[in-house]
């Protein structure tokens, strides 16, 4: 499995023949200056955790250019269908549901956040936010938490899915901060490795992963903080 972080919550995962982008906020991302074309090369799937603009990002352009499958909640799926994405390439789901993505499955799990898109000064409701658990038959299970606070039912996510890799928001203000995120990882999960995200993008959120790293000291989980664009082989 290969994972590349592009800053904020944008990731590319290559595993089991799939090339997946999650929350592809690439153009306009202050921590990634090289556009969406490179990260989207050969992509087979685009997965979205919720409907905020800094997570939808370049989804429409990527879908039109690559022919990738969209995996998202019902409302986001309908939104992109109305933008001209063919229904055959849209794979919707919702809380608790698991969808077959061809080569892996995605399960929609809870996240404590909000989800809408602002257009022409108005908010467009785009369903509930989610975390996403990706199961690969012959590789590690990945849990992208989306944007969220800590919550007690993370224990059920561990019980049901046993994710080995965690992609964890730590930037505070709009998600849990680093210390709380570390508590979530240590109390509820047995991750082999975690990559913190949703930090350092805008001045209003935490700029470094130091609080998270400090909170994870002594844990068996490996904390990886690659610079944006650097591939990690897991």
From Swiss-Prot:
Keyword Isomerase: no
Record-level Gene Ontology MF annotations: hydrolase activity
Key word Hydrolase present: yes
InterPro entries, A to Z: Metallo-B-lactamas, RibonucZ/Hydroxyglut_hydro, UPF0173, UPF0173_UPF0282_UlaG_hydrolase
One Pfam family, short name: Lactamase_B_3
Entry keyword set: Hydrolase
SUPFAM superfamilies in UniProt: Metallo-hydrolase/oxidoreductase
Protein family per UniProt: Belongs to the UPF0173 family.
Protein name (Swiss-Prot/TrEMBL): UPF0173 metal-dependent hydrolase Meso_1362
Originating species: Chelativorans sp. (strain BNC1)
Lineage: Bacteria, Pseudomonadati, Pseudomonadota, Alphaproteobacteria, Hyphomicrobiales
């Amino acid at each position: 499995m290969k994972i590349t972080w592009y800053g904020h919550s944008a990731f590319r995962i290559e595993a089991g023949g799939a090339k997946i982008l999650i929350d592809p906020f690439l153009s306009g991302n202050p921590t990634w200056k090289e556009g969406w074309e490179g990260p989207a090369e050969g992509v087979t799937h685009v997965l979205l955790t919720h409907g905020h603009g800094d997570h939808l990002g370049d989804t429409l352009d990527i879908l039109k250019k690559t022919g990738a499958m969209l995996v998202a909640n019902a409302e986001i799926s309908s939104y992109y269908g109305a933008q001209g994405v063919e229904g055959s390439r849209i794979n919707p789901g919702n809380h608790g549901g698991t969808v077959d993505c061809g080569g892996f499955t995605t399960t929609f799990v809870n996240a404590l956040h909000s989800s809408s898109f602002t257009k022409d000064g108005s908010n467009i409701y785009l369903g509930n936010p989610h975390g996403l658990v990706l199961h690969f038959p012959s590789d590690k299970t990945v849990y992208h938490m989306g944007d969220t606070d800590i919550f007690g039912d993370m224990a059920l996510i561990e019980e049901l899915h046993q994710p080995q890799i965690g992609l964890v928001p730590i930037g505070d203000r709009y998600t849990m901060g680093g210390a709380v995120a570390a508590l979530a990882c240590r109390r509820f999960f047995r991750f082999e490795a975690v990559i913190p995200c949703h930090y350092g993008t805008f001045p209003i959120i935490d700029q470094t992963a130091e609080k998270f790293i400090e909170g994870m000291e002594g844990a068996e989980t490996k904390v990886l903080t690659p610079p944006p664009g650097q591939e990690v082989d897991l």
